[in-house]
């Protein structure tokens, strides 16, 4: 999962290099890495991640689970390439992807959770409820973060014709969405 996130950060930096050029503090490419090296790093992360995920799927006799990896890589790529400039949808995708990462915990222990369901149903239900609530909390926190980033990048996004949430709906409406998410968190 870490390599998927790392590759997502690299591909996002590649596609955002023109927008990031307007914010000297956000500039990664070409300030620290060349474009060629960034593409090589992206391919390296994806290749290594694919090999590790295939190995783990093979070792656990769950080859079908390997398909989660290319789906996640594709979603992060399509976000960086297109959905970042698609109002709210890109924010929701990244917030969901990031926020639901902790649901890998009950998924990894699904056999134990299945046994627990039959041994102590109230405890099983309570654990599931807590994981779901934690997932919702994390998604909302990350959605607030994504909306704040859109507000921060309003000028560079609008100058590059990137219709982020803040550009499309305006600063006031995006601030209202952010406050609404924060209220929902409380």
Regions found by a protein language model. Name each.
Residues 13-17, 87-92, 110-119, 151-155:
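A cytosolic-side transmembrane-helix exit/cap motif
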Residues 17-63, 69, 161-186:
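Multi-pass membrane catalytic core of lipid/isoprenoid biosynthesis enzymes
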Residues 31, 92-110, 166-171:
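Small-residue-rich segments of transmembrane alpha-helices in multi-pass membrane proteins
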Residues 41-43, 86, 90-95:
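Membrane-interface loop-to-helix entry segments
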Residues 46, 81, 99-100, 113-186:
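C-terminal membrane-associated helical module and adjoining short loops/tails
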Residues 49-57, 76-80, 101-109:
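Structural signal for membrane-spanning alpha-helices in multi-pass inner-membrane proteins
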Residues 57-60, 80-89:
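Membrane-interface helix caps and helix-loop-helix hairpins in membrane proteins
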